[in-house]
Structure formats: structure tokens, C-alpha cells
From Swiss-Prot:
GO terms for molecular function: 3-isopropylmalate dehydratase activity. The gene is leuD. Catalyzes the isomerization between 2-isopropylmalate and 3-isopropylmalate, via the formation of 2-isopropylmaleate. Signal peptide: none annotated. Pathway: Amino-acid biosynthesis; L-leucine biosynthesis; L-leucine from 3-methyl-2-oxobutanoate: step 2/4. Heterodimer of LeuC and LeuD. This is 3-isopropylmalate dehydratase small subunit. Its EC number is 4.2.1.33. Pfam families: Aconitase_C (PF00694). Keywords: Amino-acid biosynthesis, Branched-chain amino acid biosynthesis, Leucine biosynthesis, Lyase. GO terms for biological process: L-leucine biosynthetic process. NCBIfam families: leuD (TIGR00171), PRK01641.1 (NF002458).
Length: 189
């Protein structure tokens, strides 16, 4: 997993609520046996239906931040949705709320999800309609800076530490293997 500390990027405005995992990556693209190759299918059905869909706009092709509406990532628990987003270059999603399962899948795969109040998210989304608008995400300080304003966000301290150091669950366990072995030995008596 790639470490994340600070990011400055333009943002993709997607002011839709209840974006479910099937919208993010349709089920017919889940036939692979590897974790790779999902990014090209991100929002496939929405891109096909609407040529003006924001993910069809080349002005946002290098954007690493996505701004969305309430309840992002709802629906099934497919981890493929997170893989598709990260493989498409998305490193941060800002929304008023996220599905719990999606939130956990994102944290385990290095995708930073930031919840801000709905009015703030809508304001940022409106500003992101200009592809030149950029913002800075500072995970260490837990701030979003945009257009002269700074917004603070909460983030789980354990997940924050793992993301800053680039540790997925397995790497974290390996890093603490000696402590785990000592504990196991002490339990055996």
C-alpha cells in the first residue's frame, strides 16, 4: 500500500447520492481472478450512457480527489469498487457520508475517505466544476484546504497511522510479529 501524507490535486465533482458499488464497478466486470485491471471499468455504465458524464471529461483525467454526495459506496460489499477507484488514480473521496463496509474496504486498501458536512461538500463540489480548482488534503493535520478555507476532519488514529506509513493489514501484522509471538507464548503458559 502506498503511503499517504499530503496531496494537492484538482477534484472530480460527482454530486450524486447513493452511489452504490454496482455503479462504481458493474458486476459483469468482476470475472477476473486478480486484483488488477478494474480502473478502466470505473463507472462504466454511467460513462456509456452519458457522454457528458464527468469521468468522460479529459480535463479531470489527472484528478486524484473525488467529491460526491451522501452514502457513497452503498450496496454490496464488493471490494472491487475500491480497487477500481484506486486503479483509476483516485486517492481521496470527500462526501457527507459513506457506507460502513465501503469505508472499511477503503481504509484497508489505502483510499482515504473524508466526511465533511453536506453544505461544505456541496460548496467544494460546485467549485470543482472548474477543472482548474484544486485542494490540498493533509492527513497528518487532518485538514482539507481549498480556496483560502481550511476544513478539519476526523479520522481513526490507527487507520491514519497505517495510511501515513503505507501499511496494509498484513504488513502491519508482519511488523508486529515478534510482539504477537511473545503474546502467544505467554498464553500457552
Amino acid at each position: 500500500m502506498q503511503a499517504f501524507k499530503k496531496l494537492t490535486s484538482s477534484a472530480i465533482p460527482l454530486w450524486l447520492s447513493d452511489i452504490d458499488t454496482d455503479m462504481i464497478i458493474p458486476a459483469n466486470f468482476l470475472t477476473q481472478t486478480t486484483k488488477d485491471g478494474y480502473g478502466k471499468s470505473l463507472f462504466h455504465n454511467l460513462k456509456e450512457k452519458d457522454s457528458s458524464f464527468v469521468f468522460n471529461n479529459p480535463d479531470y483525467s489527472n484528478s486524484e480527489i473525488l467529491i460526491a454526495g451522501d452514502n457513497f459506496g452503498c450496496g454490496s460489499s464488493r471490494e472491487h469498487a475500491v480497487w477500481a477507484l484506486t486503479q483509476a488514480g483516485i486517492k481521496v473521496i470527500i462526501a457527507p457520508s459513506f457506507s460502513d463496509i465501503f469505508f472499511n474496504n477503503a481504509a484497508k486498501n489505502g483510499l482515504l475517505l473524508i466526511s465533511l458536512d453536506k453544505d461544505t461538500v456541496k460548496e467544494l463540489c460546485d467549485k470543482a466544476e472548474d477543472p482548474k480548482f484544486s485542494m490540498t488534503i493533509d492527513l497528518q493535520e487532518q485538514t482539507v484546504s481549498a480556496d483560502g478555507s481550511i476544513y478539519s476532519f476526523d479520522y481513526d488514529p490507527f487507520r491514519k497511522d497505517c495510511l501515513i506509513r503505507g501499511l496494509d493489514d498484513m504488513t502491519y501484522l508482519i511488523e508486529h510479529l515478534d510482539i504477537i509471538k511473545q503474546f502467544e507464548q505467554s498464553q500457552r503458559g
